[in-house]
């Protein structure tokens, strides 16, 4: 497996999903499936990355993604080290580059970064010799979330993505999850619909390869899957929403609205959820929900990413 991966994986970094060819994407998902199977065993730890080191550099708050990467690294037997902005010299005014160079002097094999500035991951990848994984940069991209979402859908759909319809619902304007999912899923032939109030749609969305809706009933009709995005409550405080109750009335995914989708439609949510605001509790806990599947897929997918980057052929880009 390792020798095969060395010959097939050319990328030093994972910055966004559009850097992957279809063959590379399928190889990554197939690798994740192998690790998913390992994660179901009584003993989940394998020696695959023993002796490798992974630094988790989260300059923005995170619970799910950071924990998922930490678990992924440990299950591969890598040494993982965590650094948050509150515990780093960034808080004292040190530049991102100097902090990263200090970390690289420790000779890690992979640096996983989350940062509030769009482009931060690429900035580091262009300057550091170790592999860099973008765990979310501003509103720009969240490739590992899109990959685990794709993996979760593949568990249901198989490889028949072409012609499927996915509705992404919620705060699209400020969502790196939506941006990466649009890139990835449309490249596989999925028809993507975006649904949000006009104040939560991004500028230039008319140029995206998507259909845009402000009416949720129309957006979910005959959809194969619906992805709800967390509504950040500060959007209402910023005046982008008139009233949270009105938002819930118009944009909460309820049983009645899900009935408008296809009978076998699945529901996704990257978390954390605002139950009763963007998704009804009965939907979040329903058999159609893939929310917990996404959590399991996240560990397996991130194991695959760490494995591929840490064992790649030198000289890849």
Curated annotation (Swiss-Prot):
Subunit structure of this chain's protein: Heterododecamer (2C3:3R2) of six catalytic PyrB chains organized as two trimers (C3), and six regulatory PyrI chains organized as three dimers (R2).
Associated pathway: Pyrimidine metabolism; UMP biosynthesis via de novo pathway; (S)-dihydroorotate from bicarbonate: step 2/3
Top-tier EC class: transferase
Cellular component, GO annotation: cytosol
Residue numbers binding L-aspartate: 92, 176, 230
Function: Catalyzes the condensation of carbamoyl phosphate and aspartate to form carbamoyl aspartate and inorganic phosphate, the committed step in the de novo pyrimidine nucleotide biosynthesis pathway.
InterPro entries: Asp/Orn_carbamoyltranf_P-bd, Asp/Orn_carbamoylTrfase, Asp/Orn_carbamoylTrfase_sf, Asp_carbamoyltransf, Asp_carbamoyltransf_Asp/Orn-bd
NCBIfam families: asp_carb_tr, PRK00856.1
Membrane-traversing stretches: none
Pfam families: OTCace, OTCace_N
Gene: pyrB
Family that this chain belongs to: Belongs to the aspartate/ornithine carbamoyltransferase superfamily. ATCase family.
Highest taxon listed in the record's lineage: Bacteria
Signal peptide residue numbers: none
GO MF terms, alphabetically ordered: amino acid binding; aspartate carbamoyltransferase activity
E.C. numbers: 2.1.3.2
SUPFAM superfamilies xref list: Aspartate/ornithine carbamoyltransferase
Catalytic activity field: carbamoyl phosphate + L-aspartate = N-carbamoyl-L-aspartate + phosphate + H(+)
One GO-annotated biological process of the protein: 'de novo' UMP biosynthetic process
Descriptive protein name: Aspartate carbamoyltransferase catalytic subunit
Protein residues bound to carbamoyl phosphate: 64-65, 114, 142, 145, 271-272
PROSITE patterns the UniProt entry points to: CARBAMOYLTRANSFERASE
Keyword terms of this UniProt record: Pyrimidine biosynthesis, Transferase
């Amino acid at each position: 497996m390792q020798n095969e991966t060395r010959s097939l994986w050319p990328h030093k970094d994972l910055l966004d999903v559009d850097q992957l060819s279809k063959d590379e994407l399928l190889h990554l998902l197939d690798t994740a499936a192998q690790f998913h199977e390992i994660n179901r065993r009584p003993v989940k730890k394998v020696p695959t990355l023993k002796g490798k080191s992974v630094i988790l550099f989260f300059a923005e708050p995170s619970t799910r993604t950071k924990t998922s990467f930490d678990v992924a690294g440990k299950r591969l037997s890598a040494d993982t080290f965590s650094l948050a902005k509150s515990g780093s010299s960034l808080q004292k005014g040190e530049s991102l580059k100097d902090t990263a160079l200090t970390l690289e002097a420790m000779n890690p094999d992979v640096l996983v970064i989350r940062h509030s500035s769009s482009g931060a991951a690429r900035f580091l990848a262009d300057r550091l010799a170790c592999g860099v994984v973008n765990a979310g940069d501003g509103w720009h991209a969240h490739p590992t979330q899109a990959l685990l979402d794709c993996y979760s859908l593949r568990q249901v759909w198989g490889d028949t993505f072409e012609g499927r319809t996915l509705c992404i619902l919620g705060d699209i304007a400020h969502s790196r999850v939506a941006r990466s999912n649009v890139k990835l899923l449309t490249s596989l032939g999925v028809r993507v619909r975006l649904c949000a109030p006009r104040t939560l749609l991004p500028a230039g969305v008319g140029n995206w390869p998507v259909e845009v809706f402000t009416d949720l009933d129309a957006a979910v009709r005959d959809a194969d899957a619906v992805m709800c995005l967390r509504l950040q409550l500060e959007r209402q405080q910023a005046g982008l929403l008139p009233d949270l109750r009105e938002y819930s009335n118009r944009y909460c995914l309820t049983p009645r609205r899900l009935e408008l989708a296809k009978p076998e439609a699945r529901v996704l949510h990257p978390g954390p959820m605002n139950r009763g605001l963007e998704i009804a509790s009965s939907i979040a806990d329903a058999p159609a929900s893939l929310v917990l599947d996404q959590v399991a897929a996240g560990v397996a997918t991130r194991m695959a990413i760490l494995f591929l980057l840490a064992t790649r052929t030198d000289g890849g880009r």
